[in-house]
């Protein structure tokens, strides 16, 4: 009996040790700090993206094009601001909440009355090559499924650097909805000098580019 008990205890300890090696810091709490190695991986992703100012200019140009196409094919549609969003001055959305970077979102715009299905098809047909040239792909289906056909109400877009454009047509009961988001990027100045003091982690005021825990460094304190 004692031998069986010892064998069971040893087996349980073995399983516990195996699990300990596999469990990540945020396995049970998705909001927990995932560890320095994972944070460095995420920071390197952001460091490799275009500067925030570059993305802002690209989105400003695309915004003008989107509005021009809607005005061309659906002149009855008028835009208004429906929802004012809070603009992040520092920090990014999940999974980059502990990453050094900035993320900005537009207001949520509504177009009334919405383009007709025929007008909408003309609009997205002209926008398709524009989005493709800017590096976007459709973001209107669940992962693993093909994009919805051209002319479907949802013509939202996403790019590999995290930039998103939400563009969804309405109908005779609801307006067109439109907004965009830069995703997490570094301002150009943060590559040559630290962020302003009030935008640095409170417990790590001496951060500097490339903002890594590992070599070549830039962070020394665990992120909250």
Curated annotation (Swiss-Prot):
Which positions anchor the lipid (N-palmitoyl cysteine)? 22
- Signal peptide range equals 1-21
Mark the residues modified by lipid (S-diacylglycerol cysteine).
22
Give the record's keywords alphabetically. Answer: Cell membrane, Lipoprotein, Membrane, Palmitate, Signal
Where is the protein situated, by its record's location annotation?
Cell membrane
Q: Which Pfam families match?
A: LppA
Q: Which GO terms describe its cellular component?
A: plasma membrane
Question: Known InterPro entries for this protein?
Answer: LppA/LppB/LprP
Query: What is the protein's membrane topology class?
Result: Lipid-anchor
Report the main location listed first in the record.
membrane
Show the Gene3D superfamilies listed in the entry.
Answer: 3.30.2030.20
Q: Which residues form a coiled coil?
A: none
Report the sequence similarity comment from the record. To M.tuberculosis LprP.
Protein name as it appears in the record: Uncharacterized lipoprotein LprP
Q: State the organism named in the record.
A: Mycobacterium bovis (strain ATCC BAA-935 / AF2122/97)
Give the lineage: Bacteria, Bacillati, Actinomycetota, Actinomycetes, Mycobacteriales
Q: Which gene encodes it?
A: lprP
């Amino acid at each position: 009996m004692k031998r069986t008990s010892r064998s069971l205890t040893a087996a349980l300890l073995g399983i516990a040790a195996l699990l300990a090696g596999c469990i990540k810091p945020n396995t049970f709490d998705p909001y927990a700090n995932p560890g320095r190695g994972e944070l460095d991986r995420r920071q390197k992703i952001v460091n490799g993206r275009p500067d925030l100012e570059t993305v802002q200019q690209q989105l400003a140009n695309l915004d003008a094009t989107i509005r021009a196409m809607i005005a061309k094919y659906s002149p009855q549609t008028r835009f208004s601001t429906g929802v004012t969003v809070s603009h992040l001055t520092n920090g990014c959305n999940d999974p980059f909440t502990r990453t050094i970077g900035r993320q900005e979102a537009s207001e949520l715009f509504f177009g009334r009355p919405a383009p007709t299905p025929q007008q909408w098809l003309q609009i997205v047909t002209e926008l398709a090559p524009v989005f493709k040239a800017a590096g976007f792909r459709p973001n209107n289906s669940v992962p693993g499924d093909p994009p919805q056909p051209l002319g479907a109400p949802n013509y939202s877009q996403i790019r590999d650097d995290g930039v998103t454009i939400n563009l969804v047509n309405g109908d005779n009961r609801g307006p067109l909805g439109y907004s965009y988001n830069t995703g997490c990027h570094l301002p150009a100045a943060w590559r040559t000098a630290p962020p302003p003091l009030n935008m640095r982690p409170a417990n790590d005021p001496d951060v500097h580019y490339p903002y890594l825990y590992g070599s070549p460094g830039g962070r020394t304190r665990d992120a909250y």
